């Protein structure tokens, strides 16, 4: 079981535009100055987390966590007021890996030499429900379409080597449970499609012997308990799930763990 992991990163204090440019050019122009800057900041931040004693640090998250995954999708277009599906979303061939994770993977040997042992990294992706909230038009199958794409991104970014590996995959759903959304009303087709989308993503994770975590900001809607392949539930420190008596019973009944969240 994971001992400790973190969520996100402190804001980048240096040249944000150069960092974002490096992330965008990462696959096409490896010798570009902005790409080298991007790599340097990713490694520095990741090593800071390791040296702080975090067992499974998340890759540095200095970019918008929704836009970065929507940018990895073919068939998705940004328009005034949000996004639209020009065709069924799929993973772009030239952007099928998370640049931050590729930097860490390429520098695995150096990281291991500095830490003195093989390392694990937490891979955070934004979930289909939260991504759907950016679309102007939503139907009850949008969770399935976006979920298939995120599932492929997850599969592409799970790695394991002698120096380091992906030890935890976290699906971030900060919007879930925060809105009154008819698409996921109890008994609706959309609700079942969201459950299936989560199940498909987490099955990809657990089939690789990697732990699967769902990060929420509100657990009032208990759909997540029905996801069989989900190992770990995580929410904000003030979420009632941490104090409710029935939580322990549900954890035991569904064979899941609850991550203890700490604010520092």
Predicted regions and their residues:
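Active-site beta-loop-alpha junctions enriched in small/polar residues
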Residues: 62, 126-130, 174-176, 211-221, ...
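N-terminal basic, low-complexity leaders that serve as flexible interaction/assembly modules and, when applicable
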Residues: 1-75, 211
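Active-site-proximal, glycine-rich beta->alpha crossover segments in alpha/beta enzymes
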Residues: 74-159
């Amino acid at each position: 079981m994971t001992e400790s992991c973190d969520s996100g990163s402190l804001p980048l204090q240096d040249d944000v535009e150069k960092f974002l440019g490096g992330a965008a050019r990462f696959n096409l122009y490896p010798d570009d100055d902005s790409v080298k800057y991007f790599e340097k900041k990713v490694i520095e931040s990741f090593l800071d987390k390791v040296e702080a004693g975090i067992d499974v640090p998340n890759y540095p998250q200095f970019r918008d966590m929704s836009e970065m995954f929507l940018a990895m999708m073919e068939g998705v277009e940004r328009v005034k007021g949000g996004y639209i599906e020009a065709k069924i979303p799929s993973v772009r061939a030239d952007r099928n890996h998370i640049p931050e994770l590729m930097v860490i993977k390429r520098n695995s040997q150096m990281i291991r030499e500095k830490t003195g042992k093989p390392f694990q990294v937490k891979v955070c992706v934004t979930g289909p429900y939260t991504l759907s909230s950016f679309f102007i038009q939503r139907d009850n199958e949008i969770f399935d379409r976006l979920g298939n794409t995120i599932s492929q991104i997850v599969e592409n970014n799970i790695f394991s080597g002698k120096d380091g590996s992906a030890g935890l995959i976290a699906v971030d759903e900060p919007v879930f449970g925060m809105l009154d959304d008819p698409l996921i009303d109890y008994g609706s087709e959309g609700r079942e499609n969201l459950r299936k989308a989560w199940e498909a993503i987490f099955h990809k994770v657990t089939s690789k012997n990697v732990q699967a975590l769902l990060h929420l900001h509100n657990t009032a809607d208990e759909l997540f308990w029905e996801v069989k392949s989900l190992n770990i539930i995580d929410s904000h420190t003030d979420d009632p799930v941490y104090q409710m008596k029935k939580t322990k019973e549900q954890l035991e009944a569904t064979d899941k763990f609850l991550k203890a969240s700490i604010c520092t």
